[in-house]
Amino acid sequence: LAKIFRNQLSGRAPPARPQDARTWRETMTPIITAFERSPDGGKGLARDTRVRWALEETGQPYEVRLVSFQAMKEPAHLALHPFGQIPTYEEGDLALFETGSIVLHIAERHAGLLPGDANARARAITWMFAAVNTVEPPILELMTARILESDKPWTKDRLPLVMDRIRDRLTQLSPRLGKADWLDGAFSAGDLMMVSVLLRLRASGILEEYPGLSAYVARGEARPAYQRAFEAQLAVNTGKPPTG
């Protein structure tokens, strides 16, 4: 973690590319991009935390290139992420964007986040899609209404509607989890993505209305790999090396 922290602050360029392309792909440490200063101040809500978590769960070293909001709109970054967002993921000749895609790539390449059984593997991937396609959209609507549209005349009427849509999703999700620790057997990339999405509800108080889901998120946060990922992104915002 200390090495990663030093690379984050220095913006160190990646090592020179070896002549052997196969060696390059196999030995190149992945580089992800993250906010130079996260809008949440290091609460772990920026999407690079999901990618850090996946890399930590699979025991993979990585480097971080910090980018400013201005740099995110410049050609060099847009070549990696056409929508000018973070994170991006570079590994040799491969460049990816979108956290679902990045986490799936990591999970498929390294052991620890997808089951060996083909059917269980497919279900874990399904939960990844459910997290970002079904559960997250109304949560993002809530954040948009509260943060970016708080001064708009329609916000007061819109907020209750958005919160009801979130409750609908949580009411559907809660019985699927039931009393189990994770969504489908052992912890998987599906849980990683779902916990990451639900963490965005922490400040709203809605999650506490669903004790089973609240405990589920707490289990995810308690995982050592999540703790390492959280500390690494927090260090960027505090300027202090991770404690782990």
For each predicted feature, which ranges?
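GST-like domain detector, emphasizing the conserved glutathione-binding G-site
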Residues: 8, 23-158, 167
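Active-site-flanking alpha-helical
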Residues: 107, 197-198, 230
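Terminal-tail/helix-coil boundary detector
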Residues: 231-244
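Cationic, amphipathic, low-complexity segments that mediate targeting or membrane/lipid association
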Residues: 1-9, 15-19
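Phosphate-coordinating loops and pocket residues in cytosolic domains that bind phosphorylated ligands
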Residues: 79, 222, 231
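Short, solvent-exposed turn/loop segments enriched in Gly/Ser/Thr/Pro and often Arg
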Residues: 68, 189, 233-234
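GST-like fold's C-terminal all-alpha helical module
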Residues: 131-222
